[in-house]
Amino acid sequence: MEGLLLLLPTAIIALYLYISLIRRSRKKHNLPPGSDGWPFLGETFSYLKPHSAISIGRFMEDHISRYGKIYRSNLFGEPTIVSADAELNRFVLQNEGRLFECSYPRSIGGILGKWSMLVLVGDMHRDMRMISLNFMSAARLRTRLMPEVERQTLLVLRSWREGSTFSAQEEAKKFTFNLMAKHIMSMDPGEPETEMLRREYITFMKGVVSAPLNFPGTPYWKALKSRSSILAVIERKMEERIGRRDRGDGGVEDDDLLGWAMNQSNLLKEQILDLLLSLLFAGHETSSMALALAIYFLESCPEAVRDLRDEHLAISMSGKEGECGLSWDQYKQMEFTHCVINESLRLGNVVRFVHRKAIQDVQYKGYDIPCGWKVLPVFAAVHLDSTLYSDPHRFNPWRWQSSSSKTTAANFMPYGGGLRLCTGSELAKLEMAVFLHHLVLNYQWKLAEPEQAFAYPFLDFPKGLQIKVRAIT
């Protein structure tokens, strides 16, 4: 009791200083309108309240209605400018490193690692990004990655039994995880070590999106344990290759990302470990959710499935005699497929917002963004803006074929933008296109029970997106 009484004056002083700081900032700057919410807590819990993935949620709707598309708040423990404005979002992303920099909560860096590309800034981020870009270059996509994408697609689809019911979300995760494990460390699907890594990764992901409470039994604590297990696997692979290299016994494995980072960069072991872990996270989780969304939206739009199937029937008949598998030229013919991919990403919004911080005082549209303030460009709010997209809550892949498609594309940021544009965006589109090609040619599907995607803010299908499939004969 005595200890609590001693803490009370400290808490009151801290609260007073916090309120005084906010008030001084308001007087000094012409801030956007908004609300600071509760001291310290701000409005974070309301902002993160789960809602339908094809909406921006009650919090955003109410704040935009009351304050406009640019407003201030207090989120994640920091004063924040929230932007549902397409022009400001582009301005923030295009001025990375000059006016703004990446600024995720510390808990993200704690679990992904301090050398993760998601949290790095400056020269180190540039160097890590270059390694990733070179590994996933257009030439490698054509020659090395596309055949493997098709192989992993067929492995998953051929395991489906006629008339069976299963989780499409889990199948999508299995597909993208096996693909990334193969690309990153040449690990084959179904092998005990690969399956162990996948189980650890499931635990790891639950912690990434949980509250950062690090004590035994919490998802965050379990995720840190899984992080250690995953890194141990990567480190063991590194040591095996160093041993083979010392013996002059190289191999095909050196052509994966681990070999690429070891042989064509000056990265330290710790940096390579965090790089591979973060790319496994980025390449698996977002791509699998995007694919699950496409399956979900297509199920309720038979016209789109019909047009998609017609396109892929024509493509499958265009192959050259003796040619095995899809060619790059055939992939480039998948025009409507890319409309479906774009629309799934626009409506579903896998990446709903990003974290940035002003590194100097910035003025925009008459408002001040003070140095040190967080800025959240909310892509979902732009993608679902009725002034930019007609009937924005309807799945309409044909909108990407219209005369206004250039305007539509200008406001489309599913992979971020600027210096931090997702390095795996082309690979992600390739994965979805190849999977959809074989899916629509070989199967019909329907939802086994009513379902919808929710934003937590990470996306998830609460029931796993259960579907029932029937083979096309």
From Swiss-Prot:
GO molecular function: heme binding; iron ion binding; monooxygenase activity; oxidoreductase activity, acting on paired donors, with incorporation or reduction of molecular oxygen
Keyword Membrane appears in the UniProt entry: yes
Pathway of action: Steroid metabolism; cholesterol metabolism
Keyword RNA-binding in record: no
CDD domains: CYP90-like
Outcome following mutation: S278G: Mimicking CYP90G4, increased cholesterol 16S,22S-dihydroxylase activity and production of furostanol-type steroid
Keywords: Brassinosteroid biosynthesis, Cholesterol metabolism, Iron, Lipid biosynthesis, Lipid metabolism, Membrane, Metal-binding, Oxidoreductase, Steroid biosynthesis, Steroid metabolism, Sterol metabolism, Transmembrane, Transmembrane helix
Lineage: superkingdom: Eukaryota
UniProt cross-references to SUPFAM superfamilies, sorted A to Z: Cytochrome P450 (SSF48264)
EC number: 1.14.14.-
GO biological process, alphabetically ordered: brassinosteroid biosynthetic process; brassinosteroid homeostasis; cholesterol metabolic process; steroid biosynthetic process
UniProt tissue specificity: Mainly expressed in leaves and roots and, at low levels, in fruits and stems.
UniProt xrefs under PANTHER family: CYTOCHROME P450 26, STEROID (22S)-HYDROXYLASE
Function recorded in the entry: Canonical brassinosteroid (BR)-biosynthetic enzyme capable of converting cholesterol to 22S-hydroxycholesterol via sterol-C22 hydroxylation.
Protein name: Cholesterol 22-monohydroxylase CYP90B52
Naturally occurring in which organism (per UniProt): Paris polyphylla
